[in-house]
From Swiss-Prot:
InterPro entries: Cyt_b/b6_N, Cytb/b6-like_sf, Cytochrome_b_N_euk/bac, Di-haem_cyt_TM
Protein name from the UniProt record: Cytochrome b
UniProt keyword list: Electron transport, Heme, Iron, Membrane, Metal-binding, Mitochondrion, Mitochondrion inner membrane, Respiratory chain, Transmembrane, Transmembrane helix, Transport, Ubiquinone
GO biological process: mitochondrial electron transport, ubiquinol to cytochrome c
Lineage: Eukaryota, Metazoa, Chordata, Craniata, Vertebrata
Similarity annotation: Belongs to the cytochrome b family.
Organism this protein belongs to: Lachesis muta muta
PROSITE patterns recorded: CYTB_NTER
Membrane topology type: Multi-pass membrane protein
Listed transmembrane segments: 31-51, 75-96, 111-131, 176-196
GO MF annotations, alphabetized: metal ion binding; ubiquinol-cytochrome-c reductase activity
Amino acid sequence: YINYKNMLHQHMLTLFNLLPVGSNISTWWNFGSMLLICLMIQTTTGFFLAIHYTANINLAFSSIMHISRDVPYGWIMQNTHAIGASLFFICIYTHIARGIYYGSYLNKEVWLSGTTLLIILMATAFFGYVLPWGQMSFWAATVITNLLTAIPYLGNTLTTWLWGGFAINDPTLTRFFALHFILPFAIISLSSIHILLLHNEGSNNPLGTNSDID
């Protein structure tokens, strides 16, 4: 008689206990991997949502309702995409907090690429927030884009260019959808560079112990 359940249990213990990671790396180092999982979830669900979405001010909200009600498993995709965005930010802020606490900012290339990733992620989230074109979407698009007018000399020109006119309208929504679709690919590319730069020197050692003894 072979106890497969016990074998599986032993295999799982071996898998999680004998990972090639030093004892000087704590649970806080999991959040980088979790961010990659979030990125995969958001890209996948976002692609399927984009198939059914209509970037038109008269049809955008209706297309969201259509996804929720008529598209098979559309409600799961929409909710996963929305909740996944919140989870993304929880993970990234925890990831940053760990970096600040343990002094990861001393690795300048990795830190600067990570800072750039955060800025692009915030921009992507903002563009996505506007897409349903409800009251809050319109308010957010108006208020946030108006901040560009504070830029000396170029402010008004940049705002008009982003709006596609002298007020927020259909061209604005089309541009925001295009930007929301393309920026995740910039995030994927920069994430690859971020990981390559990290593996170039290795992660920091908060406990200062020699991991070779493990």
